[in-house]
Protein backbone atom coordinates (compact mmCIF):
# COMPACT_ATOMS: atom_id res chain seq x y z
CA UNK A 1 0.00 0.00 0.00
CA UNK A 2 2.83 2.42 0.89
CA UNK A 3 4.46 1.69 -2.46
CA UNK A 4 1.24 2.56 -4.29
CA UNK A 5 0.91 5.82 -2.36
CA UNK A 6 4.50 6.80 -3.20
CA UNK A 7 4.00 5.97 -6.87
CA UNK A 8 0.84 8.07 -6.93
CA UNK A 9 2.66 10.98 -5.29
CA UNK A 10 5.47 10.86 -7.85
CA UNK A 11 2.92 10.71 -10.66
CA UNK A 12 1.22 13.89 -9.42
CA UNK A 13 4.45 15.79 -8.67
CA UNK A 14 5.23 16.81 -12.29
CA UNK A 15 1.72 18.25 -12.62
CA UNK A 16 2.16 20.32 -9.48
CA UNK A 17 5.41 21.79 -10.82
CA UNK A 18 4.17 22.33 -14.38
CA UNK A 19 2.70 25.76 -13.68
CA UNK A 20 4.11 28.59 -15.79
CA UNK A 21 4.28 32.01 -14.16
CA UNK A 22 4.21 35.26 -16.07
CA UNK A 23 4.80 38.82 -14.94
CA UNK A 24 2.52 41.47 -16.47
CA UNK A 25 3.67 45.07 -16.08
CA UNK A 26 1.45 48.14 -16.17
CA UNK A 27 2.07 51.76 -15.31
CA UNK A 28 -1.37 52.42 -13.87
CA UNK A 29 -2.51 52.27 -10.27
CA UNK A 30 -4.18 49.16 -8.91
CA UNK A 31 -7.51 50.99 -8.51
CA UNK A 32 -7.71 51.93 -12.21
CA UNK A 33 -10.44 50.15 -14.14
CA UNK A 34 -7.77 49.10 -16.65
CA UNK A 35 -5.78 47.37 -13.90
CA UNK A 36 -8.87 45.78 -12.39
CA UNK A 37 -9.66 44.43 -15.84
CA UNK A 38 -6.11 43.07 -16.08
CA UNK A 39 -6.47 41.30 -12.75
CA UNK A 40 -9.74 39.72 -13.90
CA UNK A 41 -8.03 38.67 -17.14
CA UNK A 42 -5.24 37.01 -15.16
CA UNK A 43 -7.72 35.21 -12.94
CA UNK A 44 -9.70 34.02 -15.97
CA UNK A 45 -6.53 32.65 -17.58
CA UNK A 46 -5.49 30.76 -14.47
CA UNK A 47 -8.94 29.27 -14.07
CA UNK A 48 -9.38 28.36 -17.75
CA UNK A 49 -5.90 26.83 -17.95
CA UNK A 50 -6.58 24.75 -14.81
CA UNK A 51 -3.66 26.49 -13.12
CA UNK A 52 -1.17 25.81 -15.91
CA UNK A 53 -0.54 29.56 -16.34
CA UNK A 54 -0.48 32.10 -13.53
CA UNK A 55 -0.14 35.78 -14.42
CA UNK A 56 1.03 38.18 -11.73
CA UNK A 57 -0.02 41.79 -12.39
CA UNK A 58 2.51 44.46 -11.32
CA UNK A 59 0.76 47.85 -11.22
CA UNK A 60 1.80 51.45 -10.59
CA UNK A 61 5.09 51.41 -12.55
CA UNK A 62 6.39 48.92 -9.96
CA UNK A 63 8.09 46.60 -12.44
CA UNK A 64 8.84 48.99 -15.31
CA UNK A 65 7.78 52.53 -16.13
CA UNK A 66 4.91 52.81 -18.60
CA UNK A 67 7.03 53.86 -21.57
CA UNK A 68 9.59 51.12 -20.84
CA UNK A 69 7.11 48.26 -20.82
CA UNK A 70 7.00 47.41 -24.56
CA UNK A 71 10.79 47.10 -24.71
CA UNK A 72 10.88 45.07 -21.49
CA UNK A 73 8.34 42.59 -22.85
CA UNK A 74 10.12 42.46 -26.20
CA UNK A 75 13.35 41.55 -24.40
CA UNK A 76 11.63 38.97 -22.21
CA UNK A 77 12.22 40.85 -18.95
CA UNK A 78 8.47 40.57 -18.44
CA UNK A 79 6.24 38.16 -20.31
CA UNK A 80 3.33 40.57 -20.73
CA UNK A 81 2.52 44.23 -20.39
CA UNK A 82 0.13 47.11 -20.87
CA UNK A 83 0.84 50.58 -22.18
CA UNK A 84 -1.07 53.44 -23.69
CA UNK A 85 -1.08 52.88 -27.43
CA UNK A 86 0.33 56.29 -28.29
CA UNK A 87 3.58 55.23 -26.60
CA UNK A 88 4.12 52.98 -29.62
CA UNK A 89 3.87 55.74 -32.24
CA UNK A 90 7.60 55.90 -32.95
CA UNK A 91 7.63 52.32 -34.21
CA UNK A 92 3.94 51.98 -35.09
CA UNK A 93 2.77 55.32 -36.55
CA UNK A 94 -0.89 54.31 -36.87
CA UNK A 95 -1.03 54.01 -33.07
CA UNK A 96 -0.78 57.81 -33.05
CA UNK A 97 -4.25 58.10 -34.57
CA UNK A 98 -5.53 57.68 -31.02
CA UNK A 99 -4.36 61.19 -30.12
CA UNK A 100 -5.49 63.14 -33.19
CA UNK A 101 -8.02 65.63 -31.79
CA UNK A 102 -11.69 65.40 -32.71
CA UNK A 103 -11.40 62.54 -35.21
CA UNK A 104 -13.15 60.20 -32.77
CA UNK A 105 -16.12 61.66 -30.90
CA UNK A 106 -17.90 58.59 -29.49
CA UNK A 107 -17.30 55.01 -28.36
CA UNK A 108 -18.79 53.82 -31.65
CA UNK A 109 -16.20 55.92 -33.52
CA UNK A 110 -13.45 54.57 -31.26
CA UNK A 111 -14.52 51.00 -32.01
CA UNK A 112 -14.44 51.64 -35.75
CA UNK A 113 -10.96 53.13 -35.45
CA UNK A 114 -9.73 50.09 -33.49
CA UNK A 115 -11.19 47.77 -36.11
CA UNK A 116 -9.08 49.58 -38.73
CA UNK A 117 -5.95 49.83 -36.57
CA UNK A 118 -5.96 46.32 -35.17
CA UNK A 119 -4.65 44.23 -38.09
CA UNK A 120 -1.87 46.73 -38.79
CA UNK A 121 -0.85 47.02 -35.15
CA UNK A 122 -0.94 43.24 -34.69
CA UNK A 123 1.30 42.81 -37.73
CA UNK A 124 3.82 45.46 -36.68
CA UNK A 125 3.95 44.21 -33.10
CA UNK A 126 4.48 40.66 -34.39
CA UNK A 127 7.51 41.87 -36.34
CA UNK A 128 9.00 42.92 -32.99
CA UNK A 129 8.29 39.63 -31.26
CA UNK A 130 5.13 40.82 -29.54
CA UNK A 131 1.59 39.49 -29.69
CA UNK A 132 -1.24 42.00 -29.23
CA UNK A 133 -4.03 40.64 -27.05
CA UNK A 134 -6.62 43.37 -26.60
CA UNK A 135 -7.17 47.12 -26.37
CA UNK A 136 -9.52 49.18 -24.21
CA UNK A 137 -10.16 52.94 -24.48
CA UNK A 138 -9.99 55.52 -21.77
CA UNK A 139 -13.05 57.75 -21.38
CA UNK A 140 -12.94 60.80 -23.67
CA UNK A 141 -10.33 63.42 -22.95
CA UNK A 142 -11.38 66.74 -21.46
CA UNK A 143 -9.50 69.89 -20.51
CA UNK A 144 -8.61 70.67 -16.89
CA UNK A 145 -7.29 74.15 -16.16
CA UNK A 146 -6.46 76.12 -13.03
CA UNK A 147 -7.73 79.30 -14.70
CA UNK A 148 -10.70 79.83 -17.03
CA UNK A 149 -9.92 79.33 -20.71
CA UNK A 150 -11.53 81.73 -23.18
CA UNK A 151 -9.09 81.43 -26.07
CA UNK A 152 -5.82 79.78 -27.07
CA UNK A 153 -3.99 82.87 -25.82
CA UNK A 154 -4.79 81.81 -22.25
CA UNK A 155 -2.30 78.93 -22.57
CA UNK A 156 0.71 81.06 -23.48
CA UNK A 157 3.43 80.84 -20.84
CA UNK A 158 1.59 78.16 -18.85
CA UNK A 159 2.61 74.55 -18.14
CA UNK A 160 0.56 71.75 -19.64
CA UNK A 161 0.78 68.12 -18.59
CA UNK A 162 1.71 65.87 -21.52
CA UNK A 163 1.94 62.10 -21.85
CA UNK A 164 2.63 61.38 -25.53
CA UNK A 165 3.97 63.10 -28.67
CA UNK A 166 0.48 64.31 -29.58
CA UNK A 167 -0.08 66.16 -26.32
CA UNK A 168 3.44 67.60 -26.50
CA UNK A 169 2.63 69.02 -29.94
CA UNK A 170 -0.67 70.47 -28.73
CA UNK A 171 1.10 72.21 -25.84
CA UNK A 172 3.69 73.64 -28.21
CA UNK A 173 1.05 74.92 -30.65
CA UNK A 174 -0.77 76.63 -27.78
CA UNK A 175 2.42 78.28 -26.52
CA UNK A 176 2.47 76.23 -23.32
CA UNK A 177 5.44 74.40 -21.85
CA UNK A 178 5.02 70.60 -22.06
CA UNK A 179 5.51 68.82 -18.71
CA UNK A 180 5.74 65.03 -18.88
CA UNK A 181 3.86 63.64 -15.86
CA UNK A 182 2.71 60.01 -15.51
CA UNK A 183 -0.92 59.63 -14.48
CA UNK A 184 0.04 58.18 -11.10
CA UNK A 185 2.00 61.38 -10.33
CA UNK A 186 -0.59 63.96 -11.42
CA UNK A 187 -1.77 64.87 -7.93
CA UNK A 188 1.80 65.23 -6.69
CA UNK A 189 2.69 67.49 -9.62
CA UNK A 190 -0.37 69.67 -9.04
CA UNK A 191 0.36 69.97 -5.33
CA UNK A 192 3.90 71.05 -6.16
CA UNK A 193 2.60 73.74 -8.52
CA UNK A 194 4.17 72.17 -11.61
CA UNK A 195 1.04 72.17 -13.78
CA UNK A 196 -1.51 74.73 -14.97
CA UNK A 197 -3.58 72.54 -17.28
CA UNK A 198 -3.91 69.08 -18.75
CA UNK A 199 -5.92 67.23 -21.36
CA UNK A 200 -7.02 63.95 -19.84
CA UNK A 201 -10.14 62.01 -19.00
CA UNK A 202 -12.57 63.16 -16.34
CA UNK A 203 -11.79 59.82 -14.68
CA UNK A 204 -8.16 60.85 -14.18
CA UNK A 205 -9.35 64.02 -12.51
CA UNK A 206 -11.66 62.12 -10.18
CA UNK A 207 -9.07 59.48 -9.28
CA UNK A 208 -6.49 62.17 -8.51
CA UNK A 209 -8.91 64.52 -6.70
CA UNK A 210 -7.55 67.35 -8.82
CA UNK A 211 -10.21 69.88 -7.83
CA UNK A 212 -8.06 70.80 -4.85
CA UNK A 213 -5.88 72.75 -7.30
CA UNK A 214 -7.73 72.79 -10.63
CA UNK A 215 -10.97 74.76 -10.75
CA UNK A 216 -12.10 74.40 -14.36
CA UNK A 217 -13.11 71.36 -16.40
CA UNK A 218 -14.23 71.42 -20.03
CA UNK A 219 -15.75 68.25 -21.47
CA UNK A 220 -14.35 68.68 -24.97
CA UNK A 221 -14.19 64.93 -25.80
CA UNK A 222 -10.97 65.51 -27.71
CA UNK A 223 -10.05 61.86 -28.31
CA UNK A 224 -10.40 58.34 -26.90
CA UNK A 225 -6.87 56.98 -26.28
CA UNK A 226 -6.56 53.23 -25.84
CA UNK A 227 -4.42 51.01 -23.65
CA UNK A 228 -3.10 47.89 -25.35
CA UNK A 229 -2.18 44.61 -23.65
CA UNK A 230 0.41 42.36 -25.26
CA UNK A 231 2.70 39.41 -24.58
CA UNK A 232 6.11 38.19 -25.63
CA UNK A 233 5.48 35.95 -28.65
CA UNK A 234 8.08 33.37 -27.64
CA UNK A 235 6.58 33.11 -24.16
CA UNK A 236 3.15 32.64 -25.70
CA UNK A 237 4.37 30.01 -28.17
CA UNK A 238 6.04 28.08 -25.34
CA UNK A 239 2.69 27.52 -23.63
CA UNK A 240 0.80 24.27 -24.15
CA UNK A 241 -2.13 24.59 -26.56
CA UNK A 242 -4.84 24.67 -23.85
CA UNK A 243 -3.06 27.52 -22.06
CA UNK A 244 -2.70 29.49 -25.31
CA UNK A 245 -6.41 29.04 -25.92
CA UNK A 246 -7.12 30.21 -22.37
CA UNK A 247 -5.11 33.41 -22.95
CA UNK A 248 -6.81 34.15 -26.27
CA UNK A 249 -10.30 33.55 -24.90
CA UNK A 250 -9.70 35.57 -21.73
CA UNK A 251 -8.26 38.43 -23.81
CA UNK A 252 -11.39 38.62 -25.97
CA UNK A 253 -13.54 38.69 -22.84
CA UNK A 254 -11.30 41.35 -21.27
CA UNK A 255 -11.68 43.58 -24.31
CA UNK A 256 -15.47 43.36 -24.23
CA UNK A 257 -15.55 43.88 -20.47
CA UNK A 258 -13.03 46.73 -20.61
CA UNK A 259 -14.99 48.75 -23.16
CA UNK A 260 -18.08 48.42 -20.97
CA UNK A 261 -16.09 49.48 -17.89
CA UNK A 262 -14.77 52.53 -19.74
CA UNK A 263 -18.25 53.64 -20.80
CA UNK A 264 -19.56 53.11 -17.26
CA UNK A 265 -16.74 55.28 -15.92
CA UNK A 266 -18.03 58.22 -17.96
CA UNK A 267 -21.33 58.24 -16.08
CA UNK A 268 -19.61 57.71 -12.75
CA UNK A 269 -17.08 60.51 -13.18
CA UNK A 270 -19.56 63.10 -14.36
CA UNK A 271 -21.67 62.37 -11.29
CA UNK A 272 -18.58 62.57 -9.06
CA UNK A 273 -17.02 65.76 -10.43
CA UNK A 274 -18.15 68.80 -8.43
CA UNK A 275 -20.98 70.68 -10.13
CA UNK A 276 -19.22 73.92 -9.19
CA UNK A 277 -16.86 75.55 -9.89
CA UNK A 278 -16.58 73.34 -12.98
CA UNK A 279 -18.06 74.78 -16.17
Name each model-derived stretch:
Residues 4-13:
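Sec-dependent N-terminal signal peptides
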Residues 14-18:
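Sec/Tat signal peptide C-region and signal peptidase I cleavage site
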Residues 19-111, 117-271:
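N-terminal secretory/targeting leader peptides
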Residues 12-13, 33, 278:
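Alpha-helical transmembrane segments and their juxtamembrane interfaces
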Residues 270-279:
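Single conserved hydrophobic/aromatic residue that forms the stacking wall/gate
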Amino acid sequence: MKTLVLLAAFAVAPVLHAQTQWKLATGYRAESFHTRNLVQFAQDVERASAGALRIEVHANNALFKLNEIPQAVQEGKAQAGETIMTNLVRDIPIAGADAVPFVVRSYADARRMWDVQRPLIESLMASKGLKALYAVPWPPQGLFSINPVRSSADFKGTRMRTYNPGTVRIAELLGATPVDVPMVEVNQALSAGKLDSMITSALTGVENHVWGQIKQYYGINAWFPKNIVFVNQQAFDALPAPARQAVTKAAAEAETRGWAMSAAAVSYTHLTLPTTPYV
